[in-house]
């Protein structure tokens, strides 16, 4: 047993405490991090990391990862590698980093799978979900892996994340409706660990328990709704999650909707005229009426980009209000500073000639902004624009770039369009398209960890 490093670290801490010297101290680094003093934390972690202390290397790498800066992300990968031999946790975090990386190579994907597998074998149970997602999204990289067989083995061994992975597989394979009983059983068991199970349970009850939707005192709903609201009051569940559950309950496409229960939930988290109410009435008119929503929009507190976006959608789609593309454009322009989807709608207005003529450059600019903000539908629209050439010169290489990006983001109807573009793409244009795709991915994913991915990595 090697006691040298712990003894040295203890000695350094003692010297710091007694002599008030500015020597590296892991305890001080953690305290500084807790109070938001990242410079002090980074200085202590870095000095200790350079001396070979594994925990300090992990602390430094976590800080580099959380920064979101492209250069710091590259350094985080290097720092995690410093700790690989001594720490299964380092393998887990580097594996997740590589697995979540949008521009990862085939070699990096295989390395991620190996690291996550090694970490799991060493007792890091939190890697199962990212490992399953890696296999699910990259079947061509892992042709010999039977994900369902792996999940069956993990579930038989009692690993909680395997249950959640199973639900994702059901959704991805289009077999969700065939496994409602299994999903209900999983989520009843995993509510405390995975709050997203509240949404799944609401979906299951609407689809499989039609009699429940009109029985307010039904035991099945009490098992889901009341713990959800209690968890929200205790700070364990976000208002966003409650809103999502309310949206499920209000959706008639999932079953016999229950708008009254949805209203009761929303009244607790966001009394009218909160923005969640405006959106809910727009998407599911059963929770209100046009006059009620417009009244909410007229409130002084509604003078915000989200309200402008919703008004733009009302005039754009002609839903609840007469269609008026000019008014839609006006409201989308007001909203676009902070509402990314406003750029998408503007791009569609300009692309489709809703204002009386096509504005191709405005369409490209708006759609590209939306696409780079994470809107897969904008990538698909750009692929259509460049492949069809309405008001713009046909450019199949550009069309290939955006069709590929739409496919990578999981837009289901983009695959047929991509295949059609490929069939008409000359070899030289294919090469140019690949080069432009790489450049666009670098521009888009220079900071390639989204806030959601970063949070997922840190929570898992």
Swiss-Prot record:
A lipid is attached at residue 18 (N-palmitoyl cysteine). It comes from the Bacteria. A lipid is attached at residue 18 (S-diacylglycerol cysteine). It is a lipid-anchor. Disruption phenotype: Cells do not encyst. It is found in: Cell outer membrane. GO terms for cellular component: cell outer membrane. The keyword Oxidoreductase does not apply. Pathway: Glycan biosynthesis; alginate biosynthesis. Gene3D superfamilies: Tetratricopeptide repeat domain. InterPro entries: Sel1-like, Sel1_AlgK, TPR-like_helical_dom_sf. Residues 1-17 form the signal peptide. GO terms for biological process: alginic acid biosynthetic process. Keywords: Alginate biosynthesis, Cell outer membrane, Lipoprotein, Membrane, Palmitate, Signal. May be involved in the polymerization of mannuronate to alginate. Belongs to the AlgK family. This is Alginate biosynthesis protein AlgK. The gene is algK.
